[in-house]
């Protein structure tokens, strides 16, 4: 059965408990459900294969079970593994201490970004399909970088570290 990852925007241990989130997806009929880290990453199996349909089903399950709404971006584990194998950062020299991040877009509308783009300690490097690959060196200005991503791509996005993507693929 195909395996998927739901990346939820805005989830933290303060606003969503992972056992409750897991239960919501199981109640909706998803199988082999696992949460990864406490920031809204859920891995699951589903016969349904259209990611947009899975996004709506996950969001409906969370609203029904928790009374909360979180934007959800779903990708197949196979797709994420290919993305990891591609290593979109390999063509760039990264500063020491750089954090690699992936911004998952909910839709594939055209975006006019002049890349690579650098601001303070952050660089937007490459847009491949629906994903934006960036790096930043953690600093007090890091939240400004997240605001720049939102300004460039809109609010229908969620961002994860490269390490988190590796963890969900292995889950």
Identify the function of each model-found stretch.
Residues 2-39, 43-171:
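Surface-exposed, charge/polar-rich loops and edge strands
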């Amino acid at each position: 059965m195909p395996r998927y990852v739901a990346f939820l925007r805005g989830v933290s241990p303060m606003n969503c408990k992972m056992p409750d989130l897991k239960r919501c997806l199981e109640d909706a009929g998803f199988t082999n459900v696992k949460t990864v880290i406490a920031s809204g990453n859920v891995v699951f199996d589903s016969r349904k294969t259209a990611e947009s349909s899975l996004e709506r089903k996950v969001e409906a399950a969370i609203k029904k079970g928790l009374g909360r709404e979180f934007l959800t971006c779903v990708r197949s584990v196979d797709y994420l593994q290919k993305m990891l194998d591609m290593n979109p950062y390999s063509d760039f020299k990264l500063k020491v201490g750089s954090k690699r991040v992936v911004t998952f877009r909910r839709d594939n509308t055209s975006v006019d970004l002049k890349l690579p783009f650098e601001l303070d300690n952050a660089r937007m490097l490459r847009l491949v399909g629906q994903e934006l690959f960036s790096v930043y060196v953690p600093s007090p200005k890091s939240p400004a970088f997240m605001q720049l991503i939102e300004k460039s791509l809109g609010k229908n996005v969620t961002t994860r570290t490269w390490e988190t993507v590796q963890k969900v693929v292995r889950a």
